[in-house]
Amino acid sequence: MANPLRKTMVYLGLADEELDYQQGQQPAQQQQSPVQAVPTPVPAPQQQAKRAPVTPLHKPSTTTRNAAPAEMNEILTVHPKAYKDAQVIAENFREGVPVIINLSQMTDDDARRLIDFASGLSIGLYGKIERVTAKVFLLSPSHVAVSGEQSATEAEVEASFFGR
C-alpha cells in the first residue's frame, strides 16, 4: 500500500483496503477467488412529478394600453400635503381618471419626490404628465387627449421649479 494514488482511492472509498500482512501469508492460489455475478440494480419506476397549483402573487392590471376612448365623466383634483397621498393619485389614475395634482401645500423636496412618482406612474400606464402652472400638474391616461401651447413663461417656471 505504498502507492499514494491507491491510498487516496482507499480514503475516498473508491477501492477496498488490502492488508499487506494477509497477502504475504496466503498462497498464490488462494488469492484468486472465483468470479461471482454481480446483480444489476433495477431502476425504480419514474413517477410523474406532481405539480402544485400556482397562485399568482399580484393581480393582473385592469388598465389596458389601447383603452377605448370613453366619455370623460370626472377629473380628480388632489392637494397633497404629504407623500403618502400618492396612493390616492395612483389608484384613480390606474382606473383611467385624469388627475390634477396641486403641489402648493408641499415642501419642495416632497413635491419633487411626488412628481418623480407621478412620472413613473404615467410612463408605466402609458399616460402623460404635463405641467399646468408652477406647482400644478396633470396626469392624463392614454385615452385622454390634452391640447394646448407651452408659452415662454411656462418654460421659465419649469426650469426654476426643478432647479436647472
From Swiss-Prot:
Region ranges (Disordered): 21-71
Q: Which positions form S-S bridges?
A: none
Classification via Pfam families: SepF
Q: Work out whether the entry's keyword set contains Transcription.
A: no
Mainly localized where? cytoplasm
Q: Where is the composition biased (Low complexity)?
A: 22-49
GO cellular component labels: cytoplasm
Which BP terms does GO give this entry?
division septum assembly; FtsZ-dependent cytokinesis
- Please state where this protein is localized: Cytoplasm
Entry keyword annotation includes Secreted: no
Family classification: Belongs to the SepF family.
Purpose = Cell division protein that is part of the divisome complex and is recruited early to the Z-ring. Probably stimulates Z-ring formation, perhaps through the cross-linking of FtsZ protofilaments. Its function overlaps with FtsA.
Please describe the quaternary structure of this protein: Homodimer. Interacts with FtsZ.
Q: What name is this protein filed under?
A: Cell division protein SepF
